[in-house]
């Protein structure tokens, strides 16, 4: 948990200049790469369609261990670009922020959880996929 604290502190303490026109990019060494099996397992466990998760992955285009800044001060982390606004909820479920960033399997599980959460909120897979990245256009 201590490593997760330092990771989050590093992300939030970057200079304001990092939030200029370009997105700041921070890269940490991956713990475990994302594989197709990771995505298949996440889909199976969450009950979400595997095709939806692969579509989100293709759209988000992140990398294991990589974080990209957003203009609102949040960060998108890992292959599925899970936004840091979800980290407290994930931590309450026992998922460390560092794992979401650096472990491809955990990132896929977090993405599947988020898609499932949006599906439960909207009742529509298409709306859930649309809301995955942002609820606002």
Where are these regions (language model features)?
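Bacterial N-terminal signal peptides
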Residues: 6-16
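Positively charged n-region of N-terminal signal peptides that target proteins for export
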Residues: 1-3
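Catalytic glycan-binding domains that act on GlcNAc-containing polysaccharides
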Residues: 21-137
């Amino acid at each position: 948990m201590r490593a997760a604290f330092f990771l989050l502190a590093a992300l939030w303490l970057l200079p304001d200049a990092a939030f200029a026109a370009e997105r700041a990019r921070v890269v940490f060494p991956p713990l475990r790469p994302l594989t197709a099996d990771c995505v298949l397992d996440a889909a199976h466990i969450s009950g979400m369609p595997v095709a939806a998760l692969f579509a989100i992955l293709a759209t988000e285009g992140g990398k294991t261990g990589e974080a990209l800044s957003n203009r609102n001060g949040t960060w998108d982390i890992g292959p599925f670009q899970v936004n840091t606004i979800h980290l407290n909820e994930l931590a309450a479920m026992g998922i460390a922020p560092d794992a979401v960033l650096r472990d491809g399997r955990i990132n896929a599980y977090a993405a599947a959880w988020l898609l499932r959460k949006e599906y439960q909120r909207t009742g529509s897979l298409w709306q859930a996929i649309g809301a995955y990245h942002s609820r606002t256009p």
